[in-house]
Amino acid sequence: VEIPKESAPVYEKRGLHLGRDRSGYDVYVPLDLLAKHALLAGVPGSGKTYSMLHISSQLSGEYAIPVLVLEPAKKEYRALARNTKMPDLAVFSPGAAGSFPLRINPFEFPAGLKLSEHITNLVQVFEGAFDLTPPMPFLVSEGIEQVYRDHGWYPFEVNDGSRSYPSIRELYDKVAKLLDASDYAPEIRSNLKSCLQVRIGSLITREMGNVFDVPASTLSPEEWLQATCVIELESLGPDAANFLTLLLMTLIRELLRQHPKAAQDRPRHVIFLEEAHNLIGPSTVANAENGDAKVASTKYIVNMLAEVRALREAIVIADQLPTGLA
């Protein structure tokens, strides 16, 4: 007896239309299966991006499901702006000299969330974007907590919207002060300071400062779960692009936890992640303690894939080779 796969496409006219099979029949994927996530793989020119465009336009235009597209190159998704069924689509090109700027303060976090939880998540974002060997993650965590305290925050305080947020530049200065006051040997102190200032400093220099070193964000944390957006990451460079990608996924993850919805037969939000090998790598015996950002980001995204399914968040990943991810 052959039992069909639960995730197999169907020929009934329901759900997302994928196209036609070799016999000319229309093929669909039931919408409720998308919350189990999806992977599109194929060589360049095989139609991955076209398929992602097709699926995202259906989700937003026909089902009114908000989508977030994280596009590392080519700027092809801005074509969705011509879709009359997606009038509320926002396209951002952070770091580029153009008319689609994006500003996001990493220290902003959803109302109702405890600060200590966001600090933990933000440290994971840094670990996934930059190579941080011990004790650098601890120093980043301590620096983040201290700059919040400078604004009157306490770690176990719940965000009620009444306090101001720190900035990346404040973290840059705070980490240097923490190291100056530490008991590390002079050479170790100097090396740690140089490493951290290079990494954090990359988020405040030139165009990056216009993106991350800002007092307020273009969209509030809550709006990211409601808006349909395309983020063009090409102008950021790999580290900053990974930082922004993980930061946005973190905000959505925090919002989903804060505002869970009862079980329903469709996703409430969908993230499209192009060129996923930039963040996700093959299984490895490497220990996260070696400071490998790819190991940390892979672990973070794998955990998120497992967690957000129950929260009706779908993640659609596209890449050339499945073996480059697994």
What is the meaning of each model-derived region?
Residues V1-V43, Y50-S57, E62, K85-P87, ...:
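Basic- and hydrophobic-enriched, low-structure N-terminal and domain-boundary segments
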Residues A38, I231, V316:
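Conserved beta-strand position immediately N-terminal to the Walker
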Residues S46-G47, D239:
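A generic structural signal for alpha-helix starts
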Residues H54-E313:
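P-loop NTPase motor domains
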Residues D319:
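H-loop/switch region of ABC-family ATPase nucleotide-binding domains
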Residues T323-A326:
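Conserved H-loop
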